[in-house]
């Protein structure tokens, strides 16, 4: 799935066929390894690049106020990224991505390392995002909370689109066995 995202974004070249890009697409990409973060810079400098104010949805915001939306205190915002936990780095990457103008948000396993507060924040931000979100996630409950359409790779080159999230796909006749998933009580979303 990550390879497919990289192919679609031009990070990998296909071995056959072509990938055709749309026009006027501004992509923000959340990679599960968080490569877009500069570990030596502070949280503030990763987002604002030396500025005190940043433009968010056409409005000027003080960077500390904006980072507060992503649960960073002013003191923590001055911390080098290398000192942050995995969850804090994920929050920072989200803050950085949502500070850039984009109409296509690509998320590769965005819920890895997230605490409950950050997961709720991510859900809220995604629900208000004014664009298209393309996401790879194994977090079925998260998908049920935020997606309106699901692409399912059903094997033998078949990809189908279903309205809604994981539970909606099951109600529409989807089978976890089709995906090689064993559904146990503990694996089911609650």
Regions flagged by a language model, labelled:
Residues 1-190:
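ABC ATP-binding cassette signature C-motif
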């Amino acid at each position: 799935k990550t390879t497919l995202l990289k192919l679609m974004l031009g990070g990998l070249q296909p071995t056959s066929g072509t990938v055709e890009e749309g026009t006027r697409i501004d992509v923000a990409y959340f990679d599960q390894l968080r490569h877009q973060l500069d570990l030596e810079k502070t949280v503030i400098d990763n987002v604002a690049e030396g500025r005190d104010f940043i433009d968010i949805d056409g409005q000027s915001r003080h960077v500390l106020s904006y980072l507060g939306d992503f649960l960073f205190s002013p003191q923590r915002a001055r911390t080098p990224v290398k000192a942050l936990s995995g969850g804090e780095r994920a929050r920072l990457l989200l803050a950085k991505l949502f500070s850039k103008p984009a109409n296509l948000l690509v998320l590769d396993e965005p819920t890895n390392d997230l605490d409950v507060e950050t997961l709720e924040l991510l859900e809220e931000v995604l629900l208000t995002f004014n664009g298209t979100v393309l996401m790879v996630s194994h977090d079925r409950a998260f998908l049920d909370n935020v997606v309106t359409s699901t692409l399912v790779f059903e094997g033998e080159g078949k990809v189908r689109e279903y309205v809604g999230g994981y539970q909606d796909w099951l109600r529409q006749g989807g089978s976890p066995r089709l995906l090689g998933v064993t559904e146990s009580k503990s694996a089911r979303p609650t």
